[in-house]
Amino acid sequence: MARSHDTKGSGGLSQRQLRVGEQVRHTLAQVLQRGEIRDDLIERTVISVSEVRMSPDLKIATCFITPLGSADPQAVIKALASHAKFIRGRVAPSLAQMKYMPEFRFRPDTSFDNFSKIDALLRSPEVARDLSHDDDEDGGADEAPRNGDE
């Protein structure tokens, strides 16, 4: 599931960056799901890998993660970062076609928080009032005259 994190430059991401990022995301999610990383915090936390963003040279993989439950995101990120070389070795077989294995960087995925803030704003009474007011104004003007009503 792609997230809308800020990108540098106006070109966006290339097809290769997107393809490799998705391949890394899928493999990383499998490594986490199988419990291959021997760390108490990582083993007892369900971690969702929502996106992996590759650098233009494909040497850096920025992984956006969300720990599900009550786990502290920063503690989980710190634990994952301490096992980055092990993770790199586990992901390497799925990226055998690449010249270099990417360096892993872990970041919290804040897109869900942003979506919930936007949802709360859209559900606020002020917005509902404005939307109903706009509907009332537009409702009469948009109707086409019927035969005999002119």
Curated annotation (Swiss-Prot):
GO terms for cellular component: cytosol. One of its GO terms (biological process) is maturation of SSU-rRNA. InterPro entries: KH_dom-like_a/b, RbfA, RbfA_dom_sf, Ribosome-bd_factorA_CS. One of its GO terms (molecular function) is ribosomal small subunit binding. This is Ribosome-binding factor A. The gene is rbfA. Belongs to the RbfA family. It comes from the Bacteria. One of several proteins that assist in the late maturation steps of the functional core of the 30S ribosomal subunit. Associates with free 30S ribosomal subunits (but not with 30S subunits that are part of 70S ribosomes or polysomes). Required for efficient processing of 16S rRNA. May interact with the 5'-terminal helix region of 16S rRNA. It comes from Brucella suis (strain ATCC 23445 / NCTC 10510). It holds the Pfam family RBFA. Its main location: cytoplasm. Keywords: Cytoplasm, Ribosome biogenesis. Residues 126-150 are annotated as: Disordered. Monomer. Binds 30S ribosomal subunits, but not 50S ribosomal subunits or 70S ribosomes. It is found in: Cytoplasm.
